[in-house]
């Protein structure tokens, strides 16, 4: 057999595998975990919300991203987050938050620099180990008795210096916007991405659960509250908290949707283009 033919074939094979290895290393992996159904139609649509985010990320980023969506609760396989650049949790929280019994599993990923984003109810965990973990990993959490969860219209005040806001149009959206998070002491290392000023009706607790009022919330009338925030951790990973997305139809708002998609991509370590992640408006 011609030695030159063998040599050329060998070089071609090495080149092929090298190309695919480089390509694989260029792909950013994002894992979504969607919680079990807990509300009526249109609210806490965790499965639908994660699938929408997945499809719109692929629309905007194409082969730059690999996505996995685990539906209806915490994944049961042994190593669900292998090689993930970001984990996005969109699920019911509080005492029944799945992260409470899976802290070590998540910590293993965090310690290697994996990003973590918690959305809506997923920012709520009990005081103690889970609360401290979220403060470390994403900068803060919803603390029962301290935070509040009313339904109100937020008029966006965006931190235009942050990449998550790139290309995002200002918006006015009614949602169950949680606020007064229990952030790290002095809000150390926490960057506000989206703020808004709740009206006094929102602060009254009439639409929150449990019903208000809470003295410290009412007395802060007129104060802007942080609804989306970010951290860049010492381990190299990133964290984001986003308190909206109670109502699925809010993904139909261009500014709201782009902010969320930018946040997911930023959490995974991707560079956000100046116009943000551009996708079509879904019919919801």
Tell where the protein language model's regions lie, with residue ranges:
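Extracytoplasmic/secreted proteins, especially bacterial periplasmic and envelope-associated proteins
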Residues: 48, 52, 101, 105, ...
């Amino acid at each position: 057999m011609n030695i030159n033919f063998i040599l050329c074939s060998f070089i071609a094979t090495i080149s092929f595998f090298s190309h695919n290895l480089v390509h694989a290393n260029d792909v950013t992996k994002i894992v979504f975990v969607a919680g079990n159904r807990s509300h009526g139609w249109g609210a806490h649509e965790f499965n639908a919300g994660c699938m929408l985010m997945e499809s719109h990320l692929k629309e905007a980023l194409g082969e730059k991203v690999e996505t996995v969506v685990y539906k209806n609760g915490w994944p049961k396989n042994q190593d669900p987050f292998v090689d993930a650049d970001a984990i996005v949790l969109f699920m019911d929280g509080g005492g029944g938050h799945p992260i409470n019994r899976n802290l070590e599993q998540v910590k293993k990923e965090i310690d290697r620099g994996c990003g973590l984003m918690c959305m809506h109810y997923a920012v709520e965990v009990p005081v103690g180990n889970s609360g401290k973990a979220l403060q470390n990993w994403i900068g803060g959490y919803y603390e029962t008795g301290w935070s509040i969860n009313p339904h109100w219209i937020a008029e966006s005040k965006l931190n235009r210096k942050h990449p998550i806001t790139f290309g995002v149009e200002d918006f006015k959206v009614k949602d169950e916007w949680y606020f007064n998070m229990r952030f790290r002491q002095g809000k150390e290392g926490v960057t506000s991405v989206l703020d808004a000023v709740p009206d006094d009706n929102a602060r009254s607790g009439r639409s929150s659960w449990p019903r208000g009022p809470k003295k410290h919330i009412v007395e802060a009338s007129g104060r802007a509250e942080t609804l989306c925030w970010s951290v860049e951790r010492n381990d190299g990973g990133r964290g984001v908290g986003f308190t909206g997305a109670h109502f699925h139809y809010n993904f139909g708002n261009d500014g709201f949707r782009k902010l969320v998609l930018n946040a997911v991509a930023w959490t995974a370590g991707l560079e956000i283009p100046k116009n943000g992640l551009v996708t079509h408006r879904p019919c919801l």
